[in-house]
From Swiss-Prot:
It comes from the Bacteria. This is ATP phosphoribosyltransferase. The keyword Phosphoprotein does not apply. Feedback inhibited by histidine.
Length: 283
């Protein structure tokens, strides 16, 4: 059985639970419980603080972990990145009082910077030849300049609304982060086989994201032109219709190009276009 360490609460918790549910990993409960076993797949989920996850995986307390890249890089634990998951995206940035003009990184020389990520900050400052005084704070880093504890902060930024409410401005993006699936380097053969099945399910879910299944009626005399504008996985499915001169075309479209392609299809005479969501996609 595989043990997966995940964050006990917050945005990463919510998105991790959604991924497991979409991968048909059923959990009996996730509330006020440290360890929960799946009822239909050989995994159990261990709920931890996000900053404890890298160490738990590196030491073998857990076989896998779903953790923010920012925490993984900061902790420098000996675990491997298995998959980038593409959610819980954020950035680690330097921010300063918004009413002070920012001339560049040299401004931080001799300044006090509050952060929960001293390792990443120190490496960045050294690589840019900046000498600053780092104050390590856990939680509510954004209030440090306002109470005179620091001149600036280095912290996670998602929407930027927290900075605005504390009269701060983002001036340097140091790192971009997303959720990672990390693994212990010494998993047994049996656990790796379970991991392969888990990855198969996760890949099917992630591949289907931002994809739509499209069905349409197409005039046969325009079929070649219609197929030419479809960027499907290999080639679209074409089936005859009862009405002479018409056929049904089925394909998969990337949502980013959906309206662009639909417009071209309509111009070529496609009718009765039906669009459906895709839950999972196996290639």
């Amino acid at each position: 059985m595989l043990r997966i360490a995940v964050q006990a609460k917050g945005r990463l918790f919510e998105e991790t639970m959604a991924l497991l549910e979409e991968s048909d990993i059923k959990l009996s409960t996730t509330k006020r419980t440290l360890l929960v076993q799946s009822s239909n797949f050989p995994v159990e989920v261990l709920f931890l603080r996000d900053d404890d996850i890298p160490q738990s995986v590196a030491t073998g307390v857990a076989d896998l972990g779903i953790v923010g890249e920012n925490e993984f890089v900061e902790r420098q634990e000996d675990a491997e990145i298995i998959k980038r998951l593409g959610f819980s995206k954020c950035r680690l940035s330097l921010a300063m009082p918004k009413d002070i003009e920012y001339p560049g990184l040299s401004w931080f020389n001799g300044k006090k910077i509050a952060t929960s990520y001293p390792g990443i900050l120190d490496a960045f400052m050294k690589s840019n030849g900046v000498k600053a005084e780092v104050h390590v704070i856990t939680g509510s880093v954004e209030v440090a300049p306002g109470i005179g504890l620091a001149d600036a902060i280095f912290d996670i930024v998602s929407s930027g609304s927290t900075l605005v409410s504390n009269r701060l401005k983002e001036v340097e993006v140091v790192m971009r982060s997303e959720a990672l699936l990390i693994g212990n380097k010494n998993m047994s053969k049996e656990k790796k086989e379970i991991l392969d099945e888990l990855l198969f399910r996760m890949d099917a879910v992630k591949t289907a994201e931002d994809k739509k299944y499209v069905l349409m009626n197409a005039p046969k005399d325009k079929l070649e032109d219609i197929i030419a504008v479809l960027p499907g996985m290999k080639s679209p499915t074409v089936m005859p219709l009862a009405q002479d001169g018409w056929c049904s075309v089925h394909t998969v479209l990337d949502e980013k190009r959906f309206w662009e392609i639909i417009g071209k299809l309509k111009a070529l005479g496609a009718e009765g276009i039906l669009v459906l969501p895709i839950e999972k996609m196996i290639i």
